[in-house]
From Swiss-Prot:
Pfam families, A to Z: MutS_I, MutS_II, MutS_III, MutS_IV, MutS_V
Region feature (Disordered): 798-827
GO BP term, pick one: mismatch repair
Composition bias type Basic and acidic residues, residue spans: 818-827
Keyword flag DNA-binding: yes
Protein name: DNA mismatch repair protein MutS
Keywords: ATP-binding, DNA damage, DNA repair, DNA-binding, Nucleotide-binding
Taxon lineage: Bacteria, Bacillati, Bacillota, Clostridia, Eubacteriales
Gene that specifies this protein: mutS
Matching NCBIfam families: mutS1, PRK05399.1
Function: This protein is involved in the repair of mismatches in DNA. It is possible that it carries out the mismatch recognition step. This protein has a weak ATPase activity.
Amino acid sequence: MALTPMMKQYLEVKERNKDCILFFRLGDFYEMFFEDAETAARELELVLTGRDCGLENRAPMCGIPYHAANTYISRLITKGYKVAICEQLEDPSKAKGIVKRDVIKIYTPGTYSDASFLEETKNNYLMSLYLENELVCMAFADVSTGDFQCTYVKYNESSILDEISKFMPKEIVIIDSIDDTIIKAIKERFEVSFTVKNKDFFYLNASLNLKNQFPDFKEENYDDIVITGCNGLLNYIIETQKTTLIHINKLDYYETVDYLSIDINSRRNLELTETLRDKSKKGSLLWVLDKTTTAMGARLLRKWVEQPLIHKEIIENRQNAVEEILNNVPLLDDLRNNLKDVYDIERLAGKISSKTVNAKELLSLKNSIGNLPIIKKIIENYNTDLLKNIYSSLDCLEDLYSLLDNSILPSPALSIKEGGIIKDGYNKTIDELRMAKSHGTEWIASLEEQERNITGIKSLKVKYNKVFGYYIEITKSNLNQVPENRYIRKQTLANCERFITPELKEVEDKILGAQEKLMELEYNVFVEIRELIEKEIYRIKNTAKLISSIDVLQSLAIVALESNYSKPIIKLDGELLIKDGRHPVVEKMIPRDSFVSNDTILDNKDHQLLLITGPNMAGKSTYMRQVALITLMAQIGSFVPAKEAEIVICDKIFTRIGASDDLARGKSTFMVEMWEVANILNNATNKSLILLDEVGRGTSTYDGLSIAWAVIEYICKDNNLKSKTLFATHYHELTSLEGKIKGVKNYSIAVKKVDDDIIFLRKIIEGGADESYGIEVAKLAGIPSVVTNRAKEILNTLEENSPQNNDISKESSSSSNSHDKLESSVIKESESNIKTYDEISNLETNKIKEAQVEVAVEKEVTQDIKQIGFLDIEKEALIKEISSIDILNMTVKDCFDKLYDIINKAKSL
């Protein structure tokens, strides 16, 4: 049996689009067949039927109405599928043989730009990864806005993951030579789909394509890897969109060293744009700072948060603009009120370029442009360099406003192919056709009255539908009065009959002819208007960029005003000083004015590493994150939550706090911790800010203490490091390092003990904490008193029998001679030699132990520490275990299990 011609055509098109679900246009429906039908029926909850296809078995089939396609496409794209739209390319009524069909567009997670799919305040990035000579080019494009950026770095997992975490692409076009371990690492951390292409796809017409796409592109300004990597992304956009998008007209190359570097773990721990717990914006730094009034402003603010600056002049220009805006509140209110009426010009430009814009959206563009002169007049009052530059560069697009105001109706139809979109007076022919259509309505009314008089039937009506056109409807009770010669019967219904007359058909031809011509002409005129606007895309995009910038600046100003922020002093080196600093997010989540502020001094000398001790729940982690967030806010140009602040520009921020995501992927707590610490020590500089929380807690007490000590020593003594560091720990023995290792300074969280209870004062004070208050914290967490009372008895017994000589200070001085050896053994010599999680997971047990020691500290140093004077290892370990119990992260059952374990250990001593 042979396939039917239509099914043969379907399979030919499908063969060219194997990785897509093919929407095949048949009349008023998109149909899917075979495996596509089975997939779509399952994912879209459609009824799966069948169709004769010329084979022995019917082809599985399901379909959707063409006018509802976007809803179904969005659902498939969200699930990671690609959808190819195969349209009829000719009028079926005029086709000779089978109707010509082909794919006119391919929708993918990284290229789909329907409003129902996109988030207004987020970019929808498509990414390419291109590998060449141990370098990797990463390019990012947002088809909906025209944003196109790229960079290249040394080929390693951490660098790739860090860049992806900034842009959060929905889809990655990847060269087939990329290692599978990189793809696996990306899939584990991000919800992203992949499209694999070969080297030829990236090379095809590279320089020519970029010259044609980007007007300012000059080949000599870019390395070959950038040209090839960007071309792969551009080729994919053209392949899926089936056209060149002229709003993608600027290639922005950036160096990663031009921005404050924040690795993927630090972004997560600092909750810059979403929370750790539920991935929501509320509770993040972005949530606090976002008072933007436009969608494009919100997207730009997100970029600023994701890519803080390191150049002092640019930071101060932003600061000065924010300061000037907030100093004139009435002007700020006017600015905000007018920005609220500005639509998403950036994405409108994308719709104009992709030829998907409708008349209502052009009306939104007109109304937005109408506010530009008022906004520019407001900006004229400002005198800072950045605001003056925005004022002088802002194009109010008056000519486009005039064009749209003269051409588009105030309330146009949604569809651009059904008329009702062009104003009277814009096109003479349209006016004439409208007159004919209007007279036709009068003719119909006149003819209806005429027929009533002739027949004497008062209920006679002239009606219209798409099947019969115009017809005369007469009720059955009046059928005996119908003229026999003139009335031609067309349809009999239960209560009436429908007729036509020669005169009625003549009027119909005139009316419908005018209507069809009018709809066709209005569509053609609309296309002409769209093309005129399309020629000005560059101007529109530039205006959108400037409006976005002023929106972000006013947002930072209103936040500073409402939250009592101060303007930080920006320095290239010296001390980082914060007076009465506050956590920007936490203070918004608790009652007003109840947050306890704290001071901070960090430098590369006496206050290089702040060793912070204190009980769980006291606020150590909040304080450390607070310092990092204040630094980051200052480097995006924002004011900061502090009475005063002097911020030294950081090149990198690192945090080692928690390992929940990696534990969920089956990685051991200790290995996650050591891998992250090694990454920090390998990549930090003397301009970096490091946050380390409970380093060493994932292994035995003495190994952990040894590692923590060695890490402190390495950070403070290595001449190439000396990073500003906040180091929170439960190892109280480490407080003896103050005065022994230059740069170490003890701080603790103030706690007030009342009887058997404790009160957290949330204040950072000089000096180390005297105890951990683990049992008291357990009581606060709701552990039954019988448990905490028994734990206290056990703790007292253990403390009575524990050795008293816990001072490690003398060891710290004797170990300084071995620092050179530590420098090479605490971490691996280069990032390329750091074992990945998966490699470590596959090691045998004895090799895991060797890897832990190799990453952390040499065995002989650990032995030295054990000789410090801890005579009874088991008892001391049990005391430490009890005092450092993290109740907040345990269930009630876990608490009882832990207590049972402690009792058994105590009995065995």
